[in-house]
């Protein structure tokens, strides 16, 4: 059994991006800029934003966080997003979720210019993914696919993939990406009967249920690849949706939590922002 360390893979990809940004700087061109909109003082959100700020800094990418009061109105939030849409210096826009309850998250996401939607959550980018056209792919699913790339799982013809979870953020986009690579894909979720039996037929098992250590060796086919997308806090420790020690008995590859998908998500956000920059500066 081998462990797919997302943190090591992310550092390798970030090193390549840093070189590209160093080249841009050497040519005295403007640098890529990611703008993050943070509403309120949610400790988890603030921690995630700090992680993004640190990651941008590590590769020389510019980053600006717009902090708004938790009582901000929908109109004020909309105005901030529209200003960022019109700012030619801004390449990527990310609205940190969750927003306070009085704000409409969907309306905020739909306001972002699809060409600056580096989180890949705008309906237009979702449509591009559905129809296999170029567009921004959500960062966590993109990170999962990069992890599969790293072990040579680029063409999944003849492979059966099972995705545990059907969220718009992870489950659905991962299923589409696997399908685009010729895998035969099944999505299971909390209402699926015999979920363990279905999962145990998978050559590639992607787990994104949001239930700590739910998946054990009984869910895993001998020699399967298991990617654990779950992030749960239990007794002050971060754990995934898989019981790592149990799953490792049968899997050929497994991703850990922490040091797995999490670092890859942030890495893909930077990658999308760099791609947006290239699109915005074409012909300059």
Listing of model-derived features with the role each one plays in the protein:
Residues 1-28:
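Positively charged, low-complexity intrinsically disordered leader regions
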Residues 31-40:
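Short beta-strand segments enriched in small/hydrophobic residues
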Residues 39-53, 135-225, 237-245:
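Glycine-rich phosphate/diphosphate-binding loop of Rossmann-like nucleotide-binding domains
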Residues 56-70, 185-187:
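Short beta-strand elements in bilobed, periplasmic/extracellular small-molecule ligand-binding domains
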Residues 76-88:
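Short, well-structured alpha-helical segments in soluble
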Residues 95-156:
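Anion-binding alpha/beta catalytic cores of soluble intermediary-metabolism enzymes, centered on
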Residues 98, 208-211, 230-231:
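Short glycine-/small-residue-rich Rossmann-like dinucleotide-binding loops
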Residues 106-122, 126, 230-281:
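Rossmann-fold NAD(P)-binding glycine/threonine-rich loop
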């Amino acid at each position: 059994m081998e462990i797919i360390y997302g943190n090591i893979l992310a550092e390798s990809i970030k090193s390549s991006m840093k070189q590209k940004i160093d080249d841009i700087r050497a040519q005295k061109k403007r640098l890529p800029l990611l703008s993050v909109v943070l509403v309120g003082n949610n400790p988890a959100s603030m921690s995630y934003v700090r992680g993004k700020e640190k990651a941008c800094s590590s590769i020389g990418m510019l980053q600006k966080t717009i902090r708004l009061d938790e009582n901000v109105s929908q109109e004020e939030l909309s105005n901030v997003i529209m200003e960022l849409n019109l700012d030619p210096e801004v390449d990527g826009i990310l609205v940190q979720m969750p927003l306070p309850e009085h704000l409409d998250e969907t309306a905020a996401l739909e306001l972002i210019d699809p060409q600056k939607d580096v989180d890949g959550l705008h309906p237009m980018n979702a449509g591009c993914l559905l129809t296999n056209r170029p567009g921004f792919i959500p960062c966590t699913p993109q990170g999962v696919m990069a992890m599969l790339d790293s072990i040579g799982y680029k063409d999944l013809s003849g492979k059966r993939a099972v995705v545990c979870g059907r969220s718009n953020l992870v489950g659905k986009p991962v299923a589409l990406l696997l399908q685009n690579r010729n895998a035969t894909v099944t999505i299971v979720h909390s209402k699926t009967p015999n979920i363990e039996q279905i999962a145990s037929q998978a050559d590639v098992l992607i787990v994104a249920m949001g239930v700590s250590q739910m998946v054990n060796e009984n869910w895993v086919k001998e020699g399967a690849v298991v990617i654990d997308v779950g992030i749960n806090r239990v007794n002050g420790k971060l754990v995934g949706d898989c019981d790592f020690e149990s799953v490792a008995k049968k899997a050929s590859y497994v991703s850990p939590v922490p040091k797995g998908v999490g670092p890859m998500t942030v890495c893909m956000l930077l990658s999308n922002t760099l791609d947006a920059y290239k699109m915005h500066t074409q012909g300059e």
